[in-house]
Regions:
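Detector for C-terminal structural segments
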Residues: 28-30, 63-65, 79, 86, ...
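Aromatic- and charge-enriched surface segment that lines or borders ligand/interaction sites
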Residues: 49-54, 74-83, 109-153, 168, ...
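Ligand-site clamp/hinge motif
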Residues: 124, 207, 240-290, 332, ...
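Surface-exposed binding/hinge segments that line
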Residues: 156-200, 216-225, 370-382
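Extracellular/periplasmic solute-recognition and catalytic clefts
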Residues: 164-166, 222-233, 258-322, 329-333, ...
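Gly/Pro-rich hinge or "lid" segments in bacterial periplasmic/extracellular proteins
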Residues: 88-100, 145, 189-256, 261-265, ...
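N-terminal lobe/hinge region of extracytoplasmic solute-binding protein
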Residues: 25-115, 122, 142-145, 214
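A structural "hinge/loop" feature
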Residues: 27, 45-46, 65-82, 106, ...
């Protein structure tokens, strides 16, 4: 009896395993990084969209800077950032009400197994490009190969991790992956799908304004004036208007992007009624500069949109490729000398919250004090290479808010001296006698950073350091920062609730040499790369959170950026005719919010 029993149990176990595998590899309507998608297969609309929103109207957005290209898929030229999201479509679409979950879009279904070493998509039979031609598996395969080899560098990393890409049926395409990385099954769902036939005789890599890539998206570019405006029209024949992911979105008939030289001109254009909305980043201005007639009479509405996103990092990045910034003590001294509390009071009446770490304001944020538990276990193998404070705990230097900032200036002086920079004849010099000079690179129109630098310059003067600013137009600024040709520069890196492979583009050591990455600081930290590997390979939410918190410690204690302020809300002023749903997404005012789920309601 014993023998039969164990065989029977074995057979039951084997069939249970088989069933589990079959269940895991059934076509699904969505995929989440951890757990299951929140929405059922027959969902009516995204929870933060209004399925009954009326269609019609025009929204005008005032943008800073200029543009030299309308092809966001290549490195050449500067492109309006919205085009990637409004004018192109991918196999899956992202819900901004969950940390990282995708739902079917150009794909009708998605299949993968427990290991996620492969993923298979079935194309939606109705999917059409704006010219009416069907979206085919051939278009999908061509798009991945082209973007992964000659497209923008942001696409190259994923392409290297795809082992095979094959057509498995008339409307089916399968990817297998070369690496164990649970995020890849989601990432392949997010690449733009382009029309192969359009590019058979055209030069994709060098296209700019001459050829506008055809797509399957709800909006098509109707006309443009280089550097001045782009006009997008809603495609009345858009194939996907009735699928759950799209219902209640893309409600405006026309979206117009107007370009202005700087922020103050953008604001004046908004006040004059030339644009529909204005995103106010300065808390003091929000309080004191919105008393003009249109606000008083109710023509313009002030909306506050909360969010649960990490703060990301905003501030002034130090380029550690330059020997003067290589020593962490120098960077700590420069952070201490930046009197944030006084500057915040002078610029915003003290209304802005300071960024305390890269993932602050979120569940991914490092905790105060020494590293514990799983976070400590992850960091310990790298203890020898970590910056002081990574394991023990690190806090930004704080001032008492007075203009003199005496305590921090004294601390900065001591740190600089320890690092070999001493005062000789009133100037801070190294052992070779070279003076400590810093040039800060700013973008034209960035008046807020300029006023911060005016105060900072005086503080550094007391330490014997000379600081000058150089102001570049947006094209020069992009050119210089892409090749890391600066001492210190204004830096902004938004971070999401689902950090993964893109973190290598931000902090990976290949960015030391490779132009065009976000690693402006010149990080070379094996510990950071190891935490990124853990982020993408962790199969439990607990391990993922621990890896994010460990990465946050490494970045923050690295002292690469002088952080300034963040906000856990967005401040949007807009004309009263444009409305948004009461139910807000977890990510708040982010990609997928304005204009995506707003609508126009005539008075």
């Amino acid at each position: 009896g014993q023998q039969i029993n164990s065989k029977f149990i074995g057979a039951v176990f084997a069939s249970a395993l088989l069933l589990a595998n079959l269940a895991a590899a059934e076509p699904q309507h969505g995929i989440a990084m951890y757990g299951d998608p929140a929405l059922p297969h027959d969902f009516v609309s995204l929870p933060y969209a209004n399925p009954n929103a009326p269609k019609g109207g025009t929204i005008v957005s005032a943008e800073g800077g200029t543009f030299t290209s309308l092809n966001p898929h290549v490195r050449k030229g500067s492109v309006p950032w919205q085009l990637r999201f409004l004018a192109y479509e991918s196999l899956m679409g992202r819900s901004y009400d969950e940390p990282f979950t995708l739902y079917t879009l150009l794909a009708e279904s998605i299949e993968t197994d427990e290991t996620r070493r492969w993923v298979e998509f079935s194309l939606h039979p109705e999917a059409r490009f704006s010219d009416g031609s069907p979206v085919t598996v051939e278009d999908v395969i061509w798009s991945y190969e082209t973007l992964g080899t000659i497209g923008h560098p942001r696409y190259h990393g994923l392409w290297k991790k795809i082992e095979t890409l094959t057509q498995t049926g008339p409307r089916r395409v399968k990817f297998t992956f070369a690496a164990e990385d649970r995020e890849l099954a989601l990432l392949v769902g997010l690449r733009p799908i382009l029309k192969k036939a359009q590019w058979e005789t055209a030069d994709f890599e060098n296209s700019g304004l001459d050829i506008i890539p055809i797509s399957s998206a709800p909006y098509v570019i109707r006309d443009f004036d280089p550097g001045n405006y782009v006009r997008l029209m809603r495609n009345p024949e858009y194939w996907g208007k009735d699928i759950g992911f799209r219902r209640g979105t893309n409600n405006f008939d026309e979206i117009r992007l107007d370009f202005y030289a700087d922020g103050s001109v953008q604001f004046e254009a908004f006040k004059a009624g030339e644009s529909s909305s204005f995103r106010e980043l300065n808390a003091e201005r929000w309080e004191n500069s919105y008393d003009f007639d249109a606000v008083q009479t109710g023509k313009i509405v002030k909306s506050i949109i909360p969010h649960q996103r990490p703060s990301g990092i905003t501030g002034f990045v130090m380029n550690t490729r330059k020997p003067k910034f290589a020593d962490w003590r120098v960077r700590e001294a420069l952070i201490a000398a930046f009197n944030f509390e006084f500057i915040n009071q002078a610029n915003t009446g003290g209304r802005q919250e300071r960024i305390t770490s890269y993932f602050s304001n979120s569940v991914l944020s490092m905790e105060a004090g020494p590293a514990k538990g799983r976070v400590l276990e992850m960091l310990e193998p790298y203890a020898d290479s970590l910056m002081p404070g990574t394991i023990e705990g690190y806090r930004l230097p704080q001032s008492d808010g007075s203009a003199r900032n005496r305590k921090n200036i004294r601390a900065a002086d001591a740190l600089l001296s320890q690092a070999g920079w001493t005062v000789q004849n009133g100037l801070r010099r190294n052992v070779e006698g070279l003076p400590f000079e810093i040039t800060v690179t700013l973008k034209q129109g960035d008046t807020e950073s300029q006023s911060m630098m005016d105060i900072y310059q005086q503080a550094l003067e007391r330490l014997g350091i000379t600081l000058t600013t150089e102001v570049l137009d947006s094209a020069q600024y992009k050119e210089r920062t892409q090749v890391y040709d600066f001492d210190m520069a204004y830096y902004r890196r938004g971070l999401s609730l689902s950090p993964g492979n893109e973190q290598m583009l931000y902090w990976g050591s290949y960015g030391l040499e490779q132009p065009g990455t976000r690693n402006w600081m010149g990080m070379n930290a094996p510990a950071a790369e190891a935490m990124i590997a853990k982020l993408v390979s962790s199969s439990s939410r607990e391990d993922f959170l621990a890896a994010a918190k460990a990465l946050d410690r490494i970045l923050t204690a690295g002292r690469y950026v002088i952080p300034i302020h963040t906000s856990s809300i967005s401040r949007l002023a807009h004309i009263k005719e444009i409305k948004y749903p009461k139910r807000l997404p977890m990510y708040g005012d982010w990609i997928g919010f304005l204009p995506d789920v707003w609508w126009y309601e005539a008075p």
